[in-house]
Amino acid sequence: MGLLGMVGDSFGCSATGERLVSAARDGDIQEAMALLELNPRLARYSTFGIRNSPLHYSAAKGHHEIVSLLIESGVDINLRNCRGQTALMQACLYGHWKVVQILVLFKANIHKKDCFSGATAIHFAALKGHTRCLRLLVADYVPSLPEFWSVMHAKCTDETNKEAFDAVALRRLINNKSDGGVTPLHLAALHGHAECVQLLLDLGASVSEVTINDGSTIDLIGSGSTPLHYAACGGSAVCCQLLVAAGANMRAQNTNGLTPLMVARSWHKSSVEGILTKRSEVPVRILPSSYLSLPLMSIVKIARECGWRKTSVSSVCHDPCAICLDTECTVSAEGCGHEFCTKCALYLCATASSSTSIRGVPGSIPCPLCRHTIVSFVRLTSTTPIKELPWTNKSLALCAAGASTGSKYAGPAAITSSKYAGSLHRRSEMRSLRSSSVDLGCSSFRTASSGKLSSIKLNCTGADETMPCLVNCFRPDVQRSSSYRERIRRYSQFS
């Protein structure tokens, strides 16, 4: 009976975890809230086989509200599935820029690589040509400086501006190679994503990087190929023109002795043969990408320091945001001085195209009110930084099941249990949550509340590691029950 009891508990937790997975996949925010209120450790649940967590499913489907809810519930933002892919990679693969924006604000790791191809999130964004996702990924590396484009293209003579940011780190990030030496520029050029190629070139992508034969990939074009070889194979005339204008060598040969022109002929891409035959006598002018967004770094920093959620206008003395007309202004644009809320400013930086602005600084975005160019945002003096990030103690608030009512921050998961009790049909568990003792689900720990906090490790279903979680405890000498030890002893006899 001990073994059967443990199996029953496992199936019970799996069933509840599958409900959270379904809610994350379908975008049912209320169901996800209620399930996480009952058991916050379900955020780390993963399905069998592919081991996709609810965070992976919600990111792949573009449900940014559920992504934010899961992160605030204490889930590891860099959790991997069986392929080694994170939620950020999935969001970039399917082009959900709102999810990418939330993950970047929560400081997701953009340097992680998947286990099968060694690709990063930038590789996935370049593969599908999701330029908005790409510029959000480099938000912490592209400074809000008017001289950025000139410095990256070696047209700036002021040494002070060159030292204002780390251009080497940005180039290293953009030219990061996956298995086989493939860079994001290779992938964007192969699939004909011209806007993505132009943005990568503005960010310092190298046109001379070549692929290698490391035995991990099958390169049909041939190792030693440059991005121009890949563009010739893909047959994109615009990508070939951009690469040639950026200084790509049209006579470069790969290990098979093929030039880009030979590659184009072998793949029957006659549309690019004229571009690759001879260099044009009239040099092509390199224009800045319309997806380059300089103010993005400044507004991301402000959002992390002061929050980006809606804050209703507290009094008539504060003017609402001119865009949403619902939220108090928190930032102002340098130059024109127009004020916006942080959420609207983030939306402008993520979606605005610099091609619609007047002639000015490359990478600036137009002000929606006066069309003046915006290079950076500054925080208003009335905007105060938040004392505590909303995701730092959310696991404590959830495990306490409403014990943190005195907290200044109340996340979306901190809701009353009775609101969604009818949809869950778990009234017995709801009563236990309302009481002072907290049932930890699959674990046999029993806790109560006291003035001090005890740190214990909870083994999460579907996770490959333990996650420390703080819970309120009546007694400092919390121990496992004798029935639990008896079940473990009986279970060991079967193994």
UniProtKB/Swiss-Prot annotation:
Positions of RING-type zinc fingers: 321-371
Enzyme class: transferase
BP-aspect Gene Ontology terms: protein ubiquitination
Keyword terms: ANK repeat, Metal-binding, Repeat, Transferase, Ubl conjugation pathway, Zinc, Zinc-finger
GO molecular function, one term: zinc ion binding
E.C. code: 2.3.2.27
Name of the protein described by the UniProt record: Probable E3 ubiquitin-protein ligase XBOS35
Functional pathway: Protein modification; protein ubiquitination
Annotated organism of origin: Oryza sativa subsp. japonica
Gene it is expressed from: XBOS35
